[in-house]
A protein has these predicted regions:
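Catalytic-core helical/loop segments in enzymes performing group transfer/polymerization on anionic/lipid-linked
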Residues: 1-424
């Protein structure tokens, strides 16, 4: 129960330091649209476009619709620290605190304890060796109760404060999304709930495509392209939610075919273990292939200084570079892209790079391009990589994979936004 004690102590510190509940870029009252997004890097505070929703706020303002983006704070910094940083002043933004009102936090702790002991009793009553109960009874699987309940309470609080007619949020299949949908439908049934599927799907993606009782399903699902729109329809989700192809600001209009020959971009996800897997492989590859340049691009969730300290960067080969470039510049510098579960591979392929999926033995695939998961686009070791790099890839060989990626992130369609608000 150390985790619960730590949570209580953190909350007491939060109270006594009089930490803010909300941090606004600029104050606003009544709005048309509330957008729930995520702050994963402090640099994103000054960006005009949101990291997940892109230019949605600007597109809404084109139709004279006011909006507020509420950012869940994953930077590791409190609101007092963030308040000293520059904000984009063009759009309304609010950063949510990692804690909320006292009564809410007490309720969450009680819910957590109730669930923890309920599962303990079930384990003792039925079967101590029942693997599912053993798993979900572990603290690490119950920790999400705190953030899931808190975000639902914060959303309800913001709705009461700003009285929006529409609620947008990112849609990946997380539990908090369904909890928010249910609460909003219960307390504010007239609000139109719009879930935005913005990222990749894998072969084993399930929760996002799982149709539940109507009260847990969004009114509208906006997708990044026709690939996922078709998946939602195939899973019969169009019976409970309207499916619309909105597109994505990650869309690239033109592929580039004259990229540097001996250059490879590495695209890890925003998890430390995944970053380390690709970094270790990259060290081996750059040592074995000294004629190639390797550009290792950290995900915004990974703090570069911390990563450098932990990985003794001074010992890496000279042809391995930890990139500080913009994403587009990294694309321009590279012909190939090695990845695992990163959504950025879709953008890389659309730009003109050749995708190479690095798979470890006996693991479940989480390849966003799983339909093309075979050699030469899939490797498991340096020998495989070397063989792939020797291939003269012609346009015809890449045509299908590029067509798939172009249908995954399509050009944003403002007409979809216009049609939504016309009907209200």
């Amino acid at each position: 129960m150390i985790f619960v004690v730590k949570k209580i102590l953190d909350f007491l510190v939060f109270i006594f330091t009089k930490e803010k509940l909300l941090l606004y870029s600029k104050q606003t009252k009544k709005i048309d649209c509330l957008i729930i997004s995520h702050l994963i890097n402090t640099n994103h505070l000054i960006e005009k476009n949101d990291f997940y929703f892109g230019s949605l706020q600007s597109r809404l303002s084109t139709y004279k619709l006011s909006s507020l983006i509420a950012l869940r704070n994953f930077t590791g910094k409190n609101l007092r620290t963030l308040s000293k940083l520059p904000f984009d002043k063009k759009h309304y933004k609010v950063v949510l605190s990692s804690f909320f009102k006292i009564n809410v936090e007490i309720k969450i702790i009680l819910l957590f304890l109730n669930e923890f002991f309920r599962i303990k009793i079930l384990k003792n009553k039925y079967d101590k060796n029942f693997s599912l109960l053993k798993k979900i009874g572990k603290i690490k699987y119950l920790k999400s109760i705190f953030s899931n309940i808190r975000i639902s309470e914060q959303v309800i609080f913001l709705i009461k404060l700003h009285k929006p007619k529409y609620l947008f949020f990112t849609y990946e299949g997380h539990a908090w999304e369904r909890i928010v949908i249910k609460k909003v439908k219960e307390f504010f049934p007239k609000i139109i709930i719009i879930a935005y599927q913005f990222s990749i799907v894998t072969k084993y993606h399930h929760s996002m495509f799982r149709p539940l009782n109507k009260i847990y399903n969004p009114d509208i699902i906006m997708t990044s392209g026709s690939i996922t729109a078709d998946l939602f329809k195939r899973k019969k989700l169009d019976k409970t939610s309207k499916i619309l192809i909105y597109g994505s600001d990650k869309f690239t209009s033109k592929a580039h075919y004259n990229l540097p020959e001996k250059s490879i971009l590495i695209l890890p996800e925003g998890f430390c273990n995944e970053t380390n897997i690709l970094f270790n492989f990259c060290i081996l590859a750059s040592t074995y292939l000294p004629d190639f340049k390797f550009y290792f691009r950290l995900h915004p969730l990974i703090k570069k200084n911390d990563f450098i300290k932990k990985n003794c960067i001074q010992k890496i080969p000279d042809n391995l570079i930890i990139s500080n470039n913009t994403l587009e510049k990294d694309f321009e510098n590279s012909k190939y892209a090695i990845y695992r579960g990163s959504a950025t591979i879709i953008e890389a392929v659309n730009f003109g790079l050749i995708p190479i999926y690095y798979s470890q033995k006996n693991e479940i695939s989480f390849n966003p391009l799983f339909k093309f998961e075979k050699k030469p686009f899939k490797i498991q070791n340096i020998k495989d990589l070397n063989n792939t790099l020797k291939i003269n890839f012609k346009h015809e060989k890449l045509r299908k994979i590029r067509g798939y990626c172009r249908s995954f992130f399509q050009q944003p369609n403002s007409g979809i936004i216009k049609s939504l608000f016309k009907k209200k």
